[in-house]
Structures are given as C-alpha cells and as structure tokens.
Amino acid sequence: MNRERYLQEIDAVNAAGKYHPTWESLSTHPVPDWYREKRLGIFLHWGVFSVPAYHDWYARNMYIKGSPEYEYHCQHYGQPKDFGFKDFIPQFKMEAFDPQAWVKLFREAGADYIVPVAEHHDGFQNYRSELSHWNAAEMGPHRDIMGDLLVEAERAGMTLGASSHRVEHWWFLGHGQEFDSDIKQPMHLGDYAWPAMPERENQDLFSEPTPTDEFLTDWLLRCCEIVDRYHPRILYFDWWIQHSAVKPYLQRFAAYYFNVMESRGGCVINYKHDAFPFGIGVPDIERGQFAEAKPFLWQSDTSVMRGSWCYSVQPDKAVYKAPQEIVQDLLDVVSKNGRLLLNFGPKPDGTLADKDVEILHKLADWMRVNDECIHGTGLWRINQEGPTKIQEGQFADGASRNFTSEDFRFTCRGGNIYAACMACPTDGKLHIRSLREADASHLPLWHGIVRKVEVLGNPAQAAWTRDGEALHVDLGDYQSDMPVVVKIITD
C-alpha cells in the first residue's frame, strides 16, 4: 500500500465531506436510531494470546522478569530470547473455526451486534491487511477470520462492529528490550514488535515518551483500513486513545469514519476515559456500570470470565461468572439506558470453550421467555428498587452483588411496565414497592392503574393484589435460578 497516497485520500474525503476533523464538526454527528435499539452485543477476544491460554496481556507480561507470566513462559516454552511471543503465531491455527455456528449461538442468545477484536495490544491483526504482513490472512490461520465472521454475522442480521486496541502497542512490548530477548533493536515500521517503547508507570493523558507522528500515522491508517475493508457500523476503542498526542489523529479518523459511513446508515464510536468530548460517540465503562440511569446512551463491556478477556486455562483466571449474574448485569445495564457488550474468548483452534457454549445456551433459554423486557423497551420513571447497590465505575464487576428478591430493575414498552426480580424468592412472593397504591399528592410516585399482571414464562394466571405497601405478586410453585420478570399491564 502507498501510505502517502492513502493519507491524501483520507484528507480529501474529510475536506469534501459533511464532517471535518474538529470537535465542533464531529459533535454534530448523531447517534443513529438503529443503535438505540441495540441491547446486547458479543465481544470476541481472539488472537495469538489464546495459544498460551494465560490471559490477554501475556505478550507484555512474559517480558517482565520475575512476573508470573515470565516464570510460566520460561518453564513451559523456554527463555524469551529463544521463544518469543511471535513464535506462538504458527500455533494460532483456527482450523475448526465455524463462523456460521458461532453466529447461530450468538443470535439465539439474543445478541444483536458483534464486535470482534481486529487488533489487540500485541500488534497481530485478525484481518487481511495491506499495511503489515503480521496478520491472520498471511500467518497463523492463513484466513481472514474477522472478515469471514462478519460476513456470517451480516447474513444473520447482526450489526457489524470491530475493536482496535492498537494504540497501546506503542509501549506494550517495551519490557522485552530490558534484557536479552527476541525484542531488540533495530526495529522499524512494519516490524512486529515496533516500536516497543519504554513503559512508564502513569500511562495517561501526558505520559512519555510521547507517541510519534510515524506511529500515530500508522495507527490512523490501520483504523481507516478496517473501515474501508469491512464497513463496521460500530467501532470500539480501548483505553489510551485519551493521550494528548492522539487527539488530532482521533479527529481525522472520526471525520473519515463518519463521512464514509454517512451513506451506509451511520456509525457509532465507543470510547473510554473521555477520549472524545461528551456528545461524540457513546461512552463505555470497562467491567462496570453506572449506579443510576442516565439520559444518554452508554455501554458496559465485560467478560464472562473474571480474570481474563481471552481463552485461559489458568485456575485463577478462568473463573466464570454464573449465567444468573450475566443476566442480572444485562437487566441492570438496560434499565439504566445502557448496552451490554459481553465478551467471550475463543480457543486457538477456532472453537468456543464448553463453558462459553453453556452460558450462551442459558442466555438463549432466558431470552426466549423474557426478550420483551429487553429489546424494544425504554426507561421507566425509575429504574430500580431494592437494598443492593451497584458499585459505580470501571473494574467493579468483582464487587459482591448479592441480589435479593427485593431487588428489581424496571423497563417499559407499549404502556406496559416490566419489573425484573433479580433473585427469584424462595417463598414465591414478590413485593414491588414502586408500584404500590399512591394518592395524587405532590410526591412523584406512580399513580397509574394496574389492569393485569403476568409472570413471563409462567402459563398460570398470576395472583396479585395492590395496597399502600406494594404490588404483591404470588408466583405459586414457579421457581427459577434466573431473574424472574413480571409484566404489568397498565391503564
């Protein structure tokens, strides 16, 4: 690829297009209506890191002397100077990859968009690229695995996305230069480990060494190549794009992305840490959520495993969340005007782990009954009641969330209210205090009429009463290890 010519094309599109590389211009780009209908997405952390099956930062940590990953690597594969991270690439074969089967599982689980990792911090591209030979079409699987997956997802009616974690590659392999390893100078643009810069303690807005124009131009071209090759309608950026040096390149990319996708129904950027000014794109919280409902759209991305984003066999990493907890997260996020991007880590042979499949089947079973409280719904006047409080912020999904039968999340649709009980009561009795009888006083309490109450998934007529304390619903013999949804028909 002629890089200079590609840059000229990018700038020409931005000069002639509706959107220009300024925050003022980019802030006029709306979130498309189709995105407002999304509720559940599938995130896929796949790549070379799935071969050692440790966790997704293995490529960095194996070059930190004394780290658990370094010790593990030396014990199982030898010294990094003899067997580096790049030497895992031939074992990343994806020989059993069946994208059609994957997409079928995702759709049955209620997912309506998909975001595979295009390139992670390690610098290996999971798609066909003309900017680097270190990609899945030329090495490892020798297949455009992302392209093949997106084709099947589009056929199944899923909205296509992609994620870029490339910018952290600036320093991700830098520790490999601190001792005798396979990462050494000279390194040049196009080399796998390049630039492998020193990693400072504070990787944030103004951390040094500052990314160079050469590196950030390469970042820009890689992002634009993903757009031009696959036209993803959602592009997710991981952290560190908030760095001050990245901002002009973010503007150029966002303008190009918005302009290219303008005739294709629009697009959305997911970002973290206020990398974009508020109102441009959709903010994302990693492994966490907000404590209260928000008037703006937002996203929570989390993984089915607590200790890793990628496939892992390490006992302290491959700790799976229970399906009940995942559904509770979905209900909590949707009730607060959010979307849940749920991550799975495929195996290096292209299959999904048995536990992943089990979770997807459990989600499918629950969504088959309760989808109407998720898709097509909006915010109710309150989003929650109950004693259990969510710890707000990122990396909070390890905090205890012992939901009780007194905890509810609310959505509404077509004049109906949906009250999801986060933990099915053992005595079969629900007491929804937000729907109690109330007078028309100055207090902002709900004063509507309840005509009928249904328990989704329970064919029996629900017995219910309403008084000044609560709406009381008797589930009878109905029991479930998953959240139970009550549909309240109002007038």
Model segments located where?
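Mature catalytic domains of secreted/periplasmic carbohydrate-active enzymes
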Residues: 1-491
